[in-house]
Amino acid sequence: MQIQWYPGHMTKARRAMQEDLKLVDLVMELTDARAPLAGRNPDIDKLAAGKARMIFLKKADLADDQATLAWMDYFRKKGITPIRLDARKTNFKKAVVDGVKIACQEKIERDRRKGILNRPIRAMVVGIPNVGKSTFINSLAGKTAAKTGNKPGVTRGNQWIKIDKQLELLDTPGILWPKFDDEAIGMKLACVGSISDEVLNMQEIAYHLLSYGKANYNQLFEARYGAVPQPDDERDNEIVLWMENIARQRGCLKRGAETDFDKVSAQITDDFRSGRIGKVSLEVPKQV
């Protein structure tokens, strides 16, 4: 799947980010826990060199718990403080503030030695489009502090948001690279919904999810969709046959009982994104 989604304002955002980084102590990066590496901009490590770092694994309640633990260890070894974000937990703000203290411990101690007490940490929130940066800030601020939306790239200008006496955030639009050199990265982002569905082939996404699920989470996928059919003819594709079975189960049929692949593909993709299949991660450190 060749995907290129890079609006002009993103180029400006990258330049602005380089300038804004001079103002902050901490870079707070958001990524989807189901595809943490695919959901990171490859330039961030270079741009944020010398800054304290945090990474928030969003939607961790939808990801494989063991994979998430492995990712947290992976990022710790890189000097990045990882925080697992679970939509079901209510202590969100405390988890973030506690994590900031850990990530910025050196700066806080350095300020204390200079006699500077309680100076707020200034942080920048970064991430690819549609990862939920504005919602993240709103949850911290306890009010609608930044414009939010459910489509990639809705946030535009930069805003300073005062969270409390100890933390101020700069909401910066996410940056997605101009093209995906590795098609697998684009597919993972498409699966988790980080790219606008309008530019995607939903049948490819559903096919990939079923193929990946069969290989890595067969029990979960078969519990949801029934057993993978065994082709009578070696020329038949078992994943396509599986999609046809699912379509019949769900009533995703056109006139003449023909399979409506678009409709069933949308349902399979939505099942994954909403967690109805179960806890599934699309990559783990050993795979990348």
Language model segments and positions:
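Conserved active-site beta-strand-loop modules that form the wall/rim of enzyme catalytic pockets
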Residues: 87, 137, 167-170
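Helix-rich effector regions associated with P-loop NTPase G domains
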Residues: 1-26, 34-43, 47-53, 60, ...
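Alpha-helical scaffold segments in soluble metabolic enzymes
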Residues: 95, 99, 135, 208, ...
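Glycine-rich phosphate-binding P-loop
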Residues: 122-142, 146, 172
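Short phosphate-engaging motifs
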Residues: 92, 132, 168
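Solvent-exposed alpha-helices and their adjacent loops that cap or buttress functional pockets
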Residues: 116-118, 140, 161-162
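Canonical P-loop GTPase G-domain recognition
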Residues: 52-54, 60-126, 145, 252-253, ...
